[in-house]
A protein has these predicted regions:
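Short C-terminal domain-edge/linker segments immediately following a structured domain
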Residues: 44-50, 77-81, 126-131, 172-181, ...
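Short, flexible loop/turn elements at secondary-structure junctions
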Residues: 18-24, 136, 147-150, 208
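Conserved beta-sheet core of the metallophosphoesterase superfamily
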Residues: 140-144, 149-241, 245
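Core catalytic region of metal-dependent phosphoesterases/phosphodiesterases
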Residues: 2-17, 22-127
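Ser/Thr- (and often Asn-) enriched beta-sheet segments in non-cytosolic proteins
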Residues: 2, 11-13, 133, 235-237, ...
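Secondary-structure transition/turn motif
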Residues: 247-249
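An acidic, phosphate/nucleotide-engaging active-site surface
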Residues: 107-157
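Beta-strand-turn-beta hairpins that frame and shape the catalytic cleft
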Residues: 4-15, 131-144, 199-202
Length: 249
């Protein structure tokens, strides 16, 4: 398990991207470009929770593209190049990057694509699960980034799957991708220190995607009737006293 850290004496803004699925015929490229530009203009930092690429090409069993969209399918190498081109304006501002299950499938054929992308963007690479240990204006904010795994169809099932991570890994913020949803919630633990009771608040954020599931005539996600979540990312604003998050659509 990998760890990376970052320290600042100023308020910190982070755009949390996930599941961009670059190369998919239903990839919401225009919206991603808008958010990348917003991140650049604000001088903000960013993370990526994996599934950078679609990576589903005609030789993959999941390839289900309507005939009139087949000419839009990029090769895997072209998808990598396009991802690097899109995120070039944010090079050097990434705090952490993961691989998702789509990159892991590609790894069997062409190696660790997620690591390759992260290195080209001068961003720490954490695999599929890792810690980003922040210190913002004196406040310690450990973040657990996990790409995610199948957690069931309903929101409660996904929340339970995410919450289990808190029994294994202590953090203030749990960022999870894979589900293409936006269902943030909070809880807290109480502990004793110097005979006083303190509260440790925790934030659980399932990240949205840039995969517009029902935008075209057919794809693998449609065939499984997957949840159609919001298109966008999370924006974290961190100070010495507060943790705020918002959905960017």
């Amino acid at each position: 398990m990998r760890i990376t850290d970052f320290k600042t004496d100023e308020p910190l803004t982070i755009y949390n991207f996930s599941d961009t699925h670059i190369g998919a015929v239903c990839f919401a490229e225009k919206k991603l470009k808008e958010h990348i530009e917003m991140c650049r203009e604000e001088g903000a930092y960013w993370t990526h929770n994996g599934d950078w690429l679609e990576g589903i090409t005609p030789d993959d069993r999941r390839y289900m593209v309507p005939d009139d969209d087949k000419d839009k399918t990029l090769s895997t190498l072209a998808q990598i190049d396009h991802a690097l081109e899109l995120f070039e304006p944010l090079k050097g501002k990434g705090l952490a990057s993961l691989s998702g299950n789509h990159e892991m499938v590609l790894a069997r054929k062409i190696g660790d694509v997620g690591k390759r992308i992260a290195r080209r963007l001068d961003t720490p690479y954490l695999g599929e699960l890792g810690y980003l240990n922040l210190k913002v204006m004196g406040q310690n904010i450990p973040i657990l980034l996990w790409h995610g795994a199948w957690g069931g169809e309903l929101r409660g099932a996904k929340a339970n799957r995410q919450h289990r991570q808190s029994h294994k890994f202590r953090a203030k913020i749990y960022l999870t991708g894979h589900w293409h949803t936006w269902d943030p919630y909070q809880d807290s633990q109480h502990y004793i220190k110097r005979n006083k009771i303190y509260k440790y608040k925790r934030y659980y954020i399932s990240l949205p995607s840039y995969y517009d599931t029902y935008a075209n005539g057919g794809n693998y996600a449609q065939s499984r009737a997957y949840y159609d979540g919001p298109i966008g990312c999370c924006k974290l604003t961190l100070t010495d006293k507060s943790i705020k998050y918002e959905l960017m659509e």
